[in-house]
Amino acid sequence: MSQGKIVQIIGAVVDVEFPRNEVPKVYHALKVDGTEITLEVQQQLGDGVVRTIALGSTDGLKRNLVATNTERAISVPVGAGTLGRIMDVLGRPIDEAGDVQASDHWEIHRGAPSYEDQSSSTELLETGIKVIDLMCPFAKGGKVGLFGGAGVGKTVNMMELINNIAKAHSGLSVFAGVGERTREGNDFYHEMKDSNVLDKVAMVYGQMNEPPGNRLRVALTGLTMAEYFRDEKDASGKGKDVLLFVDNIYRYTLAGTEVSALLGRMPSAVGYQPTLAEEMGVLQERITSTKSGSITSIQAVYVPADDLTDPSPATTFAHLDSTVTLSRNIASLGIYPAVDPLDSTSRQMDPLVIGHEHYDTAQRVQQTLQKYKELKDIIAILGMDELSEEDKQSVSRARKIERFFSQPFHVAEVFTGSPGKYVSLKDTIRGFKAICDGEYDHLPEQAFYMVGSIEEAVEKANKMSAKA
């Protein structure tokens, strides 16, 4: 193994000089002797000098320290030994429960599956969340993005999806915490532990307080672990169906921006790295389903300043099968989950895939909400009395639909005091179809707020009238 000397340190960027005939390749990992720090080669500057990014704090590093080339990319433990464990970007345990007992190690830089290995699925994944199941259904083996600005509920929605899908899902899950709050990572760990599914989850964290190198690579570490479960065939010759949760994909882009600036690249639009689309593609193209197994991925995407045209969320959109857009306006009405049904999309929204009843109900709900949106200006200026009877009916139904989209979450029980509700797709379609048909025109709109199925709304209305 060749050895070089550190010649320059600028923040997280470290330049190392090697003999000219032993220069490491790009993405090779270097170990700094006498420390725990790993460096990843990013550029070859010539004259034997390579520019690297430190995966860890560079505090205490100094010039002339020896760095050894491992002659391979960063490798992380994979397999059953990672389940129930919390690891960092290098696959080292951070849960104080001893070493990770892994039978194999895989490099985090890997190619995407070839076209002939990939497979697509139209099987629906029920989430138990009414607005998602009805308006932007998820596909098994698909990619889902939860888009939203600061504080509109991306992480809570993701936790509820984990609660509803990962617990009911007999397969394995991998959670990659990319540049988010350590507290949320801790909450997730305890949530999984309390519900006895910790032995089916591998957790990889590179949180907000970590250097940009860690935050840039931690998503790849989590993905590599998920790929192993997908590709490693069991006795029947099949891989597994894996759930991959990433919170938050925007921080991956942001870490890339920081690294890009440190490496001296010219910034592009809004200060992002010039390689934004390529970096996103490298990650997203690997999150796919093959003939042996599937990866269903749910990614939270922070939207800077609520601007969906910002280059980072705009680049992410192209890779997704379903987009769940969280709206600040809906959150301000107290309707949670604050999903915007007119702005959320799904490739599954096809009568041949989801069935005619589901498709027709979703379309009618959308039309009713769109009509209400158009009438809002008239109502604001002239008031409800100026509307025709037909328009008044549309507005009344739209307001009931809006409130019926709200739902108490299991993960928020501690804060709200009301027990969480899981609503099956069948009940969801039945409830919204009945509202659109006018079967519940006589009920007050408040009865539809924060309930599960339509029967609960009727029960709530009866209680309200009894009190009155």
Curated annotation (Swiss-Prot):
EC assignment: the record states: 7.1.2.2
Keyword terms, alphabetized: ATP synthesis, ATP-binding, Cell inner membrane, Cell membrane, CF(1), Hydrogen ion transport, Ion transport, Membrane, Nucleotide-binding, Translocase, Transport
What topology does the record note for this protein and the membrane? Peripheral membrane protein
Which superkingdom is the protein from? Bacteria
| UniProt xrefs under Gene3D superfamilies | 2.40.10.170, Bovine Mitochondrial F1-atpase, Atp Synthase Beta Chain, Chain D, domain 3 (1.10.1140.10), P-loop containing nucleotide triphosphate hydrolases (3.40.50.300)
* Reactions the enzyme catalyzes: ATP + H2O + 4 H(+)(in) = ADP + phosphate + 5 H(+)(out)
Locations listed in the record: Cell inner membrane
Entry's Pfam families? ATP-synt_ab, ATP-synt_ab_N, ATP-synt_VA_C
Could you describe the subunit structure of this protein? Answer: F-type ATPases have 2 components, CF(1) - the catalytic core - and CF(0) - the membrane proton channel. CF(1) has five subunits: alpha(3), beta(3), gamma(1), delta(1), epsilon(1). CF(0) has three main subunits: a(1), b(2) and c(9-12). The alpha and beta chains form an alternating ring which encloses part of the gamma chain. CF(1) is attached to CF(0) by a central stalk formed by the gamma and epsilon chains, while a peripheral stalk is formed by the delta and b chains.
What is the protein name stated in its UniProt record?
ATP synthase subunit beta
Q: Which gene encodes it?
A: atpD
